[in-house]
C-alpha cells in the first residue's frame, strides 16, 4: 500500500481468501443461548426483531425444530445469491442462528481487517466473475469459488488492527453526521 501507519514496513502478503477463512458448518435449533438472527444487505447480521418483515416467518415450518446455521461474533457472513448487492459482512451482533442459505466463516486474522477486504467494491466485483446459474437474477457465488480469490494481507496483526480501528472510527463519524443531518 502507498499509505502506511508509522512503524510498519513489511510487504503485504498475497494469499487466498481461504487461507484466512474457515467455513463454519455447525447447525443448531433455536434456544435462549442461540437466538435467531437475520442477515440483510447494508445492515449485516441483526436481531431478527429488527429485520423489516415481509412475512417470511410463515414460510418456516416447525420453527423450533428446524436447524439453523450457527454464527458467532466476528464471523464473516455472506449470501451466495446476493454478492452483487453487497450481502457480505462481519457479524457485529453476536452469537446466534441464521438461515442455512447463508455461508459463515471464522477467521484467524483480525476480523475487522478481513471485513474491510470482503466488503470492498473491488473484492465484490472480483467475486462476481464466479456467479453461476441459468437465470440471471438467480445466479450465485459458491463458497468454494469465493475462497480462491487472492487478497493482500498485512503480515502483522497490529497493523491489521490499526487499519480496522481507523475505518471503524470513520464509519462512526459518518453515522454521527448522518444523525445530525436528520435532526
Model features per residue range: what roles?
Residues 1, 76, 161-173, 177-178:
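Extracellular/lumenal glycan-associated surfaces
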Residues 28-61:
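DNA target-recognition patches
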Residues 6-11, 103-113, 129, 144-159:
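Proline-centric
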Residues 4-29:
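Non-catalytic DNA-recognition/assembly elements of restriction-modification systems
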Residues 60-124, 131, 137, 142:
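A short beta-sheet element
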Residues 13-14, 174-183:
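Extended intrinsically disordered, low-complexity coil regions enriched in Ser, Thr, Gly, Ala
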Residues 1-2, 145-148, 162, 183:
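Histone-fold recognition with a strong bias for associated Lys/Arg-rich disordered tails
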Amino acid at each position: 500500500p502507498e499509505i502506511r501507519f508509522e512503524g510498519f514496513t513489511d510487504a503485504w502478503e498475497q494469499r487466498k481468501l481461504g487461507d484466512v477463512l474457515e467455513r463454519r458448518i455447525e447447525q443448531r435449533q433455536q434456544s435462549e443461548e442461540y437466538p435467531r438472527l437475520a442477515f440483510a444487505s447494508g445492515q449485516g447480521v441483526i436481531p431478527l426483531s429488527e429485520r423489516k418483515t415481509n412475512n417470511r416467518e410463515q414460510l418456516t415450518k416447525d420453527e423450533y425444530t428446524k436447524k439453523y446455521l450457527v454464527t458467532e461474533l466476528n464471523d464473516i457472513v455472506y449470501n451466495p445469491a446476493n454478492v452483487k448487492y453487497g450481502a457480505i459482512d462481519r457479524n457485529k451482533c453476536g452469537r446466534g442462528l441464521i438461515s442455512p442459505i447463508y455461508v459463515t466463516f471464522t477467521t484467524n486474522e483480525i476480523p475487522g481487517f478481513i471485513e474491510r477486504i470482503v466488503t470492498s467494491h473491488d473484492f465484490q466485483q472480483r467475486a462476481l466473475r464466479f456467479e453461476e446459474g441459468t437465470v440471471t437474477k438467480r445466479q450465485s457465488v459458491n463458497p468454494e469459488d469465493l475462497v480462491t480469490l487472492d487478497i493482500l494481507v498485512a503480515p502483522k496483526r497490529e497493523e491489521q488492527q490499526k487499519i480496522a480501528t481507523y475505518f471503524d472510527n470513520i464509519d462512526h463519524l459518518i453515522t454521527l453526521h448522518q444523525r445530525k443531518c436528520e435532526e
